[in-house]
Amino acid sequence: QYAQQIIDKYNNATDYGCSDQGKDKTICIDYSSPNVAKNFHVGHLRTTIIGNSLYKIFSKLGYKVVRINHLGDWGTQFGKLIVAYKKWGSREAVEEKGIEELMDIYVKFHEEAEKDDSLNDEARAWFLKMEQGNEEALEIWQWFRDISLKEFMRVYNILGMEFDSFAGESFYRDKTADVIKRLTDDGLLKESQGAMIV
């Protein structure tokens, strides 16, 4: 009988479990955060469910909750993917199979790079083009990103989830010059395989 009372109270009240503990406070939750051009796997699903649960709990406690999905959408893996696409991919296959095709050619890249290390040099060169704003490189990258987001949104829609921010790693690509200058001025950068590292 007690359990039924709790169930009835919960079903008939929209404020069950609510408080104003978080009034005038903001909390940011960064969750899900899948990698672009890769499958949405169980590890992403776990953090997605946990993050969304935390969002619901903090919202009920009166917090303003900012839901952040920090996508893995920038980095040398895109140089590898561009090389793979140009060597073994086709627009038709990517349009038809989406992320599955991108994963297939990415795996092919790694298999071939074990036999031919020059592929890694090509990949670094393509990523450098991306960083320098090369139109072709950025167009291919954006296409890969759009295909991935379409698939991610399909999953989020099934789960009934929304986010306040989808800004991924690429958001910061034009904001790092000041940080790099400071690291350079402080003597903290060194060159390694054509890249500057800390």
Segments and roles (model prediction):
Residues Q1-V198:
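NTP-dependent nucleotidyl-transfer catalytic core
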